[in-house]
Amino acid sequence: MTPARGDTAIHRGLRVSSPARMWCELSVDLALPELVAAGDYLVQWEFPIIGIDALSEAVERYPVRVGGARLRHAAGLLDAHSESPMESELRVIVVTGGLPPVTANLWIPTSSGHRYRGDLVFEGRRVIVEYQSVFHFGPEAFRKDMTRISRLEANVWAVIQVNLDDLGTPIELVARIRRVLDRRQLSR
């Protein structure tokens, strides 16, 4: 297939695929969570490389035989508010696990006047799922996280902390989140 105008660009003297076309091509090699993470990076709200609508159009423009269903599924899961690949992968596990709708990086006010962002927020149930990477284990980050989580819990938010090990057991992770959501539903 010969690339159409706009499908490629010159980068450092080499002709390369456009971001939209490259994302479609990656569907052959990447699993759904990784493909969504790559797409979220491209559409990230603060510094977007391309818009969600443009990626969705690319899915129709660049049909792929292998990975086509995965590509269409990934396009429907993109979120411009995701801020890390692991956060995107966690969101894919949550969404495909059949849990209620979740909002990425929602600002949450507290009674003390502080505002904190939750990685994945089930706003109606006041449940936050936080991905804790190694970045959070330094002394200063750890202290800030403790204060943030304590203040959120004091404002009747449940905070579920997740790490890389949890992503390796998605069924157990979804079940754990579901139990907390169910308890929060009963207590309302």
Which residues fall in each region the model found?
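Surface segments flanking catalytic/ligand-binding clefts of nucleic-acid enzymes
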Residues: Q44-R188
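Hydrophobic alpha-helical segments and helix pairs
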Residues: M1-G51
